[in-house]
Structure formats: structure tokens, C-alpha cells
Amino acid sequence: MRWVKSSQPRKQRRALFNAPLHKRQKLMAAPLSPELRKQYGIRSLPVRVGDEVVIMRGDFKGHRGKVVRVDLRRMRIFVEGVTITNARGEPRYYPIHPSNVMIVSLNLDDERRRQIIERKRRQRELQLALMKAAAGGSAEAIGEEGKAS
């Protein structure tokens, strides 16, 4: 399924709800902390098991923990220490949407993930260089984040 080019919210939602798992993986991205942004030169990455995150929104705001499970079907992640009690009284992980967390530590065990980070960093550097060239080569015209000031 190709991604919808329509501007109709109905069709965008339908595409989101019916997206295949390999495309949902890309939709599970969360922003990186300012320290990681500076270190890796990228703004966001898809969340993976083993990443350490801080919850930024919701009832569990401020909690910090490792991601123990990523559910692509429900588009939710489960964080260590973020639990609720079900009707039987057993603790259960509380599902959190990845847009509501910030990654503070990356799990870099996977070589392919390191390559993805490097590729995204190079792409960003290239974009910044092109923006500087388009602005007449003046470094003041481009802010630190690559936005025109």
C-alpha cells in the first residue's frame, strides 16, 4: 500500500489505521533528548526495546525507564516501572504512544541501527549545507537547528 497523498483527514486516518507493520515501525518515532540531538545530530528515531525514555505527557509524566516491549499493532510502547493494576489485582504495563516520550538513552547493540543513525546524520548535514548555500553562504542566516532565523 502506497501512502495516501490526499489532504482529507478521513483518508489519512484510514491509511494510518491500515498501515502494514513495516511502515508502522517508522511511525513509532520519538524525539531525542537535547544531549542526544547534539551528540548524533538528529532529532528523532523509532523507539526500540532497550531504549531509555522519559514520559513527557499523561498520568505517568516524568517517569523514566527502559522500553520493555514495542507493540506495532496497537502503536504503543511499554516502559519499565509504568504499571497499572488490572481487575484481578495483577500489575500490567500501561500502553504509551511513542509521541508522548523522549528518548534519553539509545540501545546501540544493533549495527544496523548505528548505520541508520549515521545515514540520518549525514542527510541532515547535507540539508544544512544546501540551506547555507541557498542563503548566500552566510552562517548567521541559518540557526543552530537549521531553521531560518
Curated annotation (Swiss-Prot):
InterPro entries: KOW, Rib_uL2_dom2, Ribosomal_uL24_CS, Ribosomal_uL24_euk/arc, Ribosomal_uL24_KOW, Translation_prot_SH3-like_sf. Pfam families: KOW, Ribosomal_L26. One of its GO terms (molecular function) is rRNA binding. It comes from the Archaea. GO terms for cellular component: large ribosomal subunit. GO terms for biological process: translation. NCBIfam families: rplX_A_E (TIGR01080). Belongs to the universal ribosomal protein uL24 family. Part of the 50S ribosomal subunit. This is Large ribosomal subunit protein uL24.
